[in-house]
Amino acid sequence: MAVKKPENMTFEATIEELDSLVDQLENGDLALDDALRKFERGIALARAGQTKLSDAEQRVSILLSEDDEAPLNDFKPDSE
């Protein structure tokens, strides 16, 4: 299986893989080279996850700040 670049993964997949890597590293049964490789992958995943989270927070902030003064209207489906 090809390893996906962290920036091409969903936030959830990034966190899931990062959690798995942390478990493996905490277990302590890895050879030094394997542990270092997994640590490097974990750092890349953590950075990508932080970027995705920051982007999402920024989008939410923009959406909440857009047109605060707009009146609220009842929802009317197109089928009416």
Swiss-Prot record:
Organism: Vibrio parahaemolyticus serotype O3:K6 (strain RIMD 2210633)
Catalytic activity, reaction form: Exonucleolytic cleavage in either 5'- to 3'- or 3'- to 5'-direction to yield nucleoside 5'-phosphates
Gene Ontology MF terms: exodeoxyribonuclease VII activity
Keyword field: Cytoplasm, Exonuclease, Hydrolase, Nuclease
Source organism, top-level taxon: Bacteria
GO biological process, one term: DNA catabolic process
Subunit field text: Heterooligomer composed of large and small subunits.
GO cellular component, one term: exodeoxyribonuclease VII complex
Recorded family membership: Belongs to the XseB family.
Classification via InterPro entries: Exonuc_VII_S (IPR003761), Exonuc_VII_ssu_sf (IPR037004)
Function comment: Bidirectionally degrades single-stranded DNA into large acid-insoluble oligonucleotides, which are then degraded further into small acid-soluble oligonucleotides.
Catalytic class of the enzyme: hydrolase
EC number: 3.1.11.6
Taxonomic lineage of the native organism: Bacteria, Pseudomonadati, Pseudomonadota, Gammaproteobacteria, Vibrionales
Cellular compartment(s): Cytoplasm
Protein name: Exodeoxyribonuclease 7 small subunit
Location, primary (coarse class): cytoplasm
